[in-house]
C-alpha cells in the first residue's frame, strides 16, 4: 500500500532489532502511515513479519545509510517522511500527534527516551543491563539476552546542539530557559535517530547528502539545513520515542556499518566546511545567526561567535 500521511524510512544493515522496531511501529500508528525498510546488504534476522503497511527492499550490496534512506524516500508518496533508526520503540499514536502540530517548514522530533531493549541473563542467576557486556562477571560464561523493550525511567531529552568542531552535544541548559518550556520547543540541532519533515522539503534541502558519506553528522546536517533555509527544528513534547544507544560489539550490539575515525571525521569536516564557511547554496541565513539565536551554547564562546561572523 502507499500511505498518504507518513512514510517511515528505516535504513538497516544487519539490525537484530529491526523486526521488533517495525512491529512496534505497526502496533502504535494511528494515522495513514507506512514503513519502508531498506535491508542494506544484509538480510535481517529475525525476519520481518508481513504486513500491508510494511514495505521491505533488499539490496545485495550495501550502499550506505544515507543512500539507503534516499532510496526509501524515493518509494514514498506520503506528505511526510520520518527517518528512524532500526532499534526504537514508540508512543501510542505518535504519528498522529506529530502531524497534529506540524508545519510545512518544520523538521520535528518527539521527546527522545533511552530504550531498555534487553538485559543480559546468565544461567548462574546473574543479570545486568544491556551495556554491561555478554560475559558473566560471576562465572565467566556467555550470557543470553532477555527482551525488555521499554523506555528507561527518567530518560527524556528535549534539546540538542553542536560545538565548534562540530560535535553533537546534549543541550540540557536550554530546557531550563523560558523558551525551552512548553509542549513545542525549538532545538538548535538533532541527535539524528529520528526526525520528520515533508517529503518535498526532504528533497528540496537534500536532507541526506550522500557526499557526507554513509554515516556521521546526520543530526547536524538535517537541523542546520532546516534552520538556514528559513525553517524551524522543533521538539514535540506531547509524544515520545525511545532509542537504543549502541556501545561496543563485544557488549552484544555494536554498529552495523563499518565505523572508522576517518569516516566520522570526514563527515564533520564536510559539515564544517559547508556550513561554517557559508557554502551551502540554499541558505538564506548564515550559521552565525543560528549560533547567536541559541547562545549561550556549550562549546561556544563569544569569541567563537565573532570569528564565525567574520568568516
Predicted regions and their residues:
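A conserved acidic beta->alpha catalytic loop
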Residues: 30-31, 37-48
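Conserved donor NDP-sugar-binding/catalytic core segment of glycosyltransferases
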Residues: 89, 93-163
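Short aromatic/hydrophobic "clamp" motif used to bind/position activated sugar donors
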Residues: 81
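Short, acidic, metal-binding catalytic loop of nucleotide-sugar glycosyltransferases
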Residues: 23-33
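Glycine-rich, basic loop-to-helix element that forms the pyrophosphate-binding segment
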Residues: 60-75
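N-proximal low-complexity "stem/linker" segments adjacent to membrane-targeting elements
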Residues: 1-24
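Terminal low-complexity segments of carbohydrate-biosynthetic enzymes
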Residues: 126, 130-136, 140-151, 164-182, ...
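A short, conserved alpha-helix in the catalytic core of glycosyltransferases
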Residues: 98, 188, 194-195, 200-206, ...
